[in-house]
Each structure stands twice: as C-alpha cells, then as structure tokens.
C-alpha cells in the first residue's frame, strides 16, 4: 500500500514589520506532495519579492515535470530577472528548500540556512546542510580557536555563504531518505530556531499553529518571521 502523506503550513510575522517568508504546498498529479519555502532578504520590498519569485518559479518548474535541480535554477533565474528589472531590488535574495515526498521516500534540494528537519521517535535530525557561517564558527569553537562568547557573538554568525540571488550557485544541498511510518518532516525558516530542538521535536505532532505559538512564547527580542510546513507520513 502506498504511504499516505498529510501536509499543512502556516507562518507568523514575529516582531518584524514585514513578512519576507514565502511557502507553498501542492499535491502533484502522481500523488507526490511538494513543499517549498523561501526566506527572503534585502529589506522590506527586496526580501518579500525575492522569496515570492523563487517560490513561484520553483513551483512552476516542478509542476511542469522538471527536476528539483531544474526548479532551483528556475528560481535563481527568476530572482536574477527581478533584480535586473528594478534598481531598488539589486542585492535581493532568498534561501530555498524544496522537498518531494511520495510513498516511503523524501527527496530535497536547498540553498541557504532554512532548516529541513526529520522527527522520528521523538528525536529531531536536520537533513539539509546549513549554508550560513554557523558550522565553521562552531568548528572553530570545538577546536579551541575561539571562546563560547566569541562564537555566540561572531559578526558573521548569521551571514550566508550561499543564497538564491541570481548568481551562479556554488553551494547546493541535495539528498534523499527512506522514511518509516509515523515520520514527520518540517520545512522551516530559521525563525523557528528560537525554540530548542527538543521542544521542536516535542511539538512536531501538534498542529503547525501550536508549534508557531511555542516559538513566539519564547519571547525572543526581534523575533524573525517564522514559517513551518509539516509533512506527516500516516502509513
């Protein structure tokens, strides 16, 4: 019997004056569930425009039967064209996570730092690579090259090594994974990281709105936009 997947998504603006996240969830003709999320950057107009362009182009590409890699390149081209059309949008960009789930397998592609989590048996695992400078900074901490305080306050900690900005992409994460019954997948913007991983795992079986409220309840100053798409394997 084919696995049955259920998906839902929602978002919150947090403490920001505007929403730069964009997400979409679609069921393709063959029953595959498609989820895509983009977290824009480049100011109020730029970030929101970039994330919309990226998601819309990615969706169109996948719905036309193209691969995840082709969808990503379409998203990148759309952001490039959008930035070229208006001078005030120069430098805009976004992260992107796209995932396809069908039967017992997930395939994904991502650029940037938006996390893609797997939750199984109460444990949270990040599936995709983090293209911010956090992994390098944490590695420096582990090697004793910097202190914990220096790592936490490093000026590049939240900077991205790669993003969908219309330039050639040098860092792209792609993968696939077999999934057991009862597995939950979470496609998120990095605003979710205000919440500890253990609490994300504990709230993964709740409705997305409940998980968003858990993030907001942390009360982090200047809470970023937060978006969560939840994919549950039912059988």
List each model region and its residues.
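PP2C/PPM-type serine/threonine phosphatase catalytic domain
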Residues: 1-235
């Amino acid at each position: 019997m084919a696995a049955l997947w259920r998906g839902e998504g929602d978002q919150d603006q947090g403490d920001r004056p505007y929403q730069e996240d964009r997400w979409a969830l679609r069921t393709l003709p063959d029953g595959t569930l498609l989820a895509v999320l983009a977290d824009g950057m480049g100011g109020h107009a730029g970030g929101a425009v970039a994330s919309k362009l990226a998601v819309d182009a990615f969706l169109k590409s996948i719905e036309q039967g193209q691969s995840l890699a082709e969808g990503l390149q379409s998203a990148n081209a759309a952001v490039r064209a959008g930035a070229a059309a208006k001078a005030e949008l120069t430098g805009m960009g976004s992260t992107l996570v796209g995932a396809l789930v069908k039967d017992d397998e997930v395939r994904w592609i991502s650029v940037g730092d938006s996390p893609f989590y797997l939750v199984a048996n109460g444990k949270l695992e990040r599936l995709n690579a983090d293209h911010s400078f956090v992994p390098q900074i944490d590695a420096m901490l582990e090697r004793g090259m910097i202190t914990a305080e220096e790592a936490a306050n490093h000026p590049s900690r939240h900077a991205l090594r790669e993003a969908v900005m219309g330039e050639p992409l040098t860092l792209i994460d792609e993968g696939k994974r077999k999934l057991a019954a009862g597995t939950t997948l979470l496609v998120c913007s990095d605003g979710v990281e205000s919440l500890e991983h253990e609490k994300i795992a504990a709230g993964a079986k709740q409705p997305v709105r409940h998980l968003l409220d858990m993030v907001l309840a942390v009360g982090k100053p200047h809470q970023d936009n937060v978006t969560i798409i939840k994919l549950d394997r039912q059988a």
